[in-house]
Swiss-Prot record:
Domain EMI: 30-107
Species assigned in the record: Homo sapiens (Human)
Record-given protein name: Multiple epidermal growth factor-like domains protein 10
Cytoplasmic side: 879-1140
GO (cellular component) term, any one: cell projection
Keyword terms: Cell adhesion, Cell membrane, Cell projection, Disease variant, Disulfide bond, EGF-like domain, Glycoprotein, Membrane, Myogenesis, Phagocytosis, Phosphoprotein, Repeat, Signal, Transmembrane, Transmembrane helix, Ubl conjugation
Swiss-Prot/TrEMBL domain comment: The EMI and EGF-like domains work in concert to promote self-assembly.
Signal peptide segment: 1-25
Transmembrane segments annotated in the record for this chain: 858-878
Glycosylated residue positions: N134, N496
Name of the gene this protein is made from: MEGF10
Amino acid sequence: MVISLNSCLSFICLLLCHWIGTASPLNLEDPNVCSHWESYSVTVQESYPHPFDQIYYTSCTDILNWFKCTRHRVSYRTAYRHGEKTMYRRKSQCCPGFYESGEMCVPHCADKCVHGRCIAPNTCQCEPGWGGTNCSSACDGDHWGPHCTSRCQCKNGALCNPITGACHCAAGFRGWRCEDRCEQGTYGNDCHQRCQCQNGATCDHVTGECRCPPGYTGAFCEDLCPPGKHGPQCEQRCPCQNGGVCHHVTGECSCPSGWMGTVCGQPCPEGRFGKNCSQECQCHNGGTCDAATGQCHCSPGYTGERCQDECPVGTYGVLCAETCQCVNGGKCYHVSGACLCEAGFAGERCEARLCPEGLYGIKCDKRCPCHLENTHSCHPMSGECACKPGWSGLYCNETCSPGFYGEACQQICSCQNGADCDSVTGKCTCAPGFKGIDCSTPCPLGTYGINCSSRCGCKNDAVCSPVDGSCTCKAGWHGVDCSIRCPSGTWGFGCNLTCQCLNGGACNTLDGTCTCAPGWRGEKCELPCQDGTYGLNCAERCDCSHADGCHPTTGHCRCLPGWSGVHCDSVCAEGRWGPNCSLPCYCKNGASCSPDDGICECAPGFRGTTCQRICSPGFYGHRCSQTCPQCVHSSGPCHHITGLCDCLPGFTGALCNEVCPSGRFGKNCAGICTCTNNGTCNPIDRSCQCYPGWIGSDCSQPCPPAHWGPNCIHTCNCHNGAFCSAYDGECKCTPGWTGLYCTQRCPLGFYGKDCALICQCQNGADCDHISGQCTCRTGFMGRHCEQKCPSGTYGYGCRQICDCLNNSTCDHITGTCYCSPGWKGARCDQAGVIIVGNLNSLSRTSTALPADSYQIGAIAGIIILVLVVLFLLALFIIYRHKQKGKESSMPAVTYTPAMRVVNADYTISGTLPHSNGGNANSHYFTNPSYHTLTQCATSPHVNNRDRMTVTKSKNNQLFVNLKNVNPGKRGPVGDCTGTLPADWKHGGYLNELGAFGLDRSYMGKSLKDLGKNSEYNSSNCSLSSSENPYATIKDPPVLIPKSSECGYVEMKSPARRDSPYAEINNSTSANRNVYEVEPTVSVVQGVFSNNGRLSQDPYDLPKNSHIPCHYDLLPVRDSSSSPKQEDSGGSSSNSSSSSE
């Protein structure tokens, strides 16, 4: 890579300016301050090897061609191209989870700590009693304290104080942990309640509920078990039958009378009754007794308490309930009711006469003398007449005597109050005024006449006669139906008394008492009401406030002028004044007039005799005495009444100095804005000022494609399919593109979205910046181009077939044939002879000579051998001469990745003295182009140590330390030239970097400070850029290549710019992936040790370099300014041996 000195200095100035402008105010000692790497791009010129087929000549045994043979080899020349290099710088900011607060970084909690404080990112320290990620959750019932970490010790459902952990016992428990129940006889909260249970019941310690003993129930166990229940909680069913009652505790049955047994299921045996069947029955004539009461149940034909009597005459059967059916004097049997007939009769009921009807006598020859209509029959033997009911007499021709009726007129009538009795049935016919079966009930009030069927017409509580319905009037009434009051001036019964009331007093028609007219009093209403009273009986008191008394009859107040109302307590109504408020006011604009004299009292904002004029401009209020405020956005002076400013549309506030609140517009801010999508509403005319990215009258339309910003006036400049933000025009690049406008491809070694994916291509293959697909270089294949072309193929895509013969090998890149011994030619198809030649040690092309070269004579062999020896000797002398001016210490090229940077860089290997135990730094090179420290004019102090080192001063300046270098081995004093890597601005570990992201191993105040140190005497050191000649290294130390396939390296040397490649001895122990090597420090130091071997790490391959396994390095420049230059001593010897 080649960068000019001016470009380098400009870039340093740019970085310094950037650091000064963006210096972080954060306290770097704050443990919460972190650093991160940010990338930026610079345009650089990089070199790359360009292969070509080189034809050269060498000595051989071909006598026909005068011992000169043509050879082919693939050589590379350095070409240049421009590219972008991604560089990195360190920037300080708050660590993730923290935010800036002054100079400190304080933790940030996404969720606000509701009951606590934020002590770490998204970590809240909660107050006692609170938990959860944001301390918003109260402790559950089992935990207390900060973050609810302490477990509660409360028992039996007690509540735990979330702050102190103290137990609040549930009802029924006590103690520190609520582990004890309430004492016997107490219950409830804090065991303060006294139990009220009775009959030996126990009390529940929580609720106070009574647990009753067997046989009791009720809230307080005060009741016995209900019938049919007994035992604990009255849950057991009584087994007693037939009405037996069980004991409420034991359940033992107490049987009713007539039953016995354990469950009262056995009736008393015959002849026994009573409780427990303990009594003996006393019934006669075959009667049985009731087992419960002992009452006798008589057999048919008997009656009496103990069944000792026969049925009465005319009855028979069970309970003597049957009536005998015997007629004509027949007698019936008291048991069965059978009839025993008298003489002259026969039949089951003695109903049959032995003589024909109407005859009697022994021979039935006599005619009966009875009245036939009133007679049942005459006796067949004696001729005696049997009268029908209601008739009597010897021949049944007489009615019953008054007061009697029925069969033989034996029954006595029950009619009362002069009622008539029917002689046959005894039915009563009541006299007027009575009713009922026996006519003993007088007519109800309001009825009269026969059977009380007529309704009375008397009124006003007059008494109605039950006989004829005539009315007897009460005092004060008269008339047929007592509906007419006594005439005025009369009173009493019959209205025959005269009233004595005066002054219009009314007389009571009942008792003649006077009811005075309003305003009068006295027994005869002869006295007027006293002052202050009025109305009936002068019982009302005048209620007047501003009056000259009240009317004695009506109580109306006589109001004074200016007052009105029922009580004269109201000022004259608005618009009225004077006596009785009878005069109208002439005041205007809402003014009021004095009720006494009618003078106008103007309302606020008006003036004048009748208040007809408004306040003068600039004044308002009562009597126009107040001055208007200074209205800002108003249409004129303030309102003459209220003093409020009349705001223009879009303004509000007392002084119209406030814009309408968001979302409102217009006069008095009454309108509602319709702007959407965060659009700002104009408070005056409602027009919308749209948020960037939106347009339209209400900002509801997004910007058209390819436009952005306010009113979508800007045109998007995004390329390669990038999405353009309508808000700020920011380009969201598609995969494979980056840059402000997505015009730049991903940097070398990166691809995909945001260029975040790392390319995996090897062997200099190109990585597609979009998909990451590898485009292999000539001679390679595979997904990551990790494989060489298979044997027999070469070229791009390995599509070309090798044309090499005679077991020769084919170069997988160019197809050049490498002949087997004894063969030559482009295709190895020509026979040759083997000679010993001094091929350039860097060439990979070997010459194969045919086996028949031994046919040459001994003379030719001797001649060639001598020539070869002379040629080698000449080469050795020339090489020694060229090496005299070179440094004894040569820089080695080392590739050391750090932080997994893909576009690999080159470093100059060396040893860094670690001050204060600091870690080593790593430096990176994208392309083989270098900065070089130029010569220093004066010599430093030296000692006998063969070493050149680069050290850091305490102010982090980079110096070349030469005090330990042997002056006899290192050439001129001015050779303080060292190679700086192209991106020396990068840093390694964070503690080796400055606040602006530059590697302190390289940066200092000025390289001129080198001469100020007491141990240094050099000066005029500056940065320069130069391209150095090739140099060839033979047998370098152990390599750490990315792939074991590469075995050569190239350095520039002044002798031959087209030097072929030298074979390098690889070590299998170093075959590992260089991208996983930890960052190391690489500075300038001596390459060779005393034993002539390299003492530094080998060359590693960059992952995305087009250089196939070699690197260009700028060696230390030769200087002829010192007289000690020719003193090569052992230095030249070491250099020569190492070179060879």
